[in-house]
Amino acid sequence: MVLTGGFARNEVFKIESMSGTLPEIMVYLVNMQEQYESVYGKEIWQRDLNGTTMSESVKDTVLANLAQVKAMNLLAQKHNVTLDEMEKQFAKEAAEEYYESLNETEIAVMQVNEEILTQMYEEYALANKVYEYIIKDINPEISDDEARTITVDYILIKTYTTDGTGEKIEYSEEDKNEARSLAEDILRQAKEEGSDFKELVLKYSEGDKGTYSFGKGETEEAFEQAAFNLATGEISSLVETPSGFYIIKCLSTFDKDQTSANKVKIVEEKREEVFGEEYDAFAQGLTRDINEKLWKSISLVDDENVSTQQFFDIYHNYFG
């Protein structure tokens, strides 16, 4: 990272010729704050994340997201990718719609007008467009085996508990041995003739009690290896993982619909990987700087008249 100096009014950071401004940061921050609060409530901001507050974590995410949009716009310049007139019109209409949804307090808090919002939507659209440009020829063939999705029921006997902050606390050796003994007893019951595995799940499992469909690389390695080696209807031996002891029953060794969906997911992951490699190499050489004084002065908004969270929803309504 190469640092420069000197900032314009309301300029929070610079990346080469691109600037991230206070109104842009506030639009991202307010929308993300309201989305979190609508799901988790205001108490989410009291949570400690290994010495960092949730509010600081969200601020850092906002900064990273906006900085990436700016860097991707520079990448678009490198590839001569631009918005066409229809896309610019969509950005203008999206900005008008979002601005009209705001009340006076929200406009004042975020310091926005239609011109600023139009630029934000244009830059966000261009970032997405350069992503699509770079990955347009990435269409790998994914085999059924690579994308295979299986369906299981399982019983989990945990070997940990959690503290008040949600952090895992490992069981003592004595408690782990008790958990193992319980799991072994349940396994014996599961393999008895006429045993109802689902009833044992409901009675004993300390994990999710629903049916679980998954593909390779989506769960703990020991669990995956044991499950993928089962035949339909077969019950595993005891599977030990960092989470605890599992007993797995295979319901289906090949879920056609889920496997097809997983192929789409794997292709997208490979495209993201290709883009990430080019983006990371490009971004490493960019000159950037942050206005520390202004950045430190930015905080979450505590105002009952501020509740907007539709900025990105409106974008997707216009751009898909």
Task: Describe the predicted segments one by one.
Residues M1-N10, S17-G20, D48-G320:
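Peptidyl-prolyl cis-trans isomerase
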Residues V12-V39:
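Periplasmic POTRA and POTRA-like interaction domains that precede
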Residues K42:
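Basic, Lys/Arg-rich alpha-helical nucleic-acid-recognition elements, primarily the DNA-binding modules
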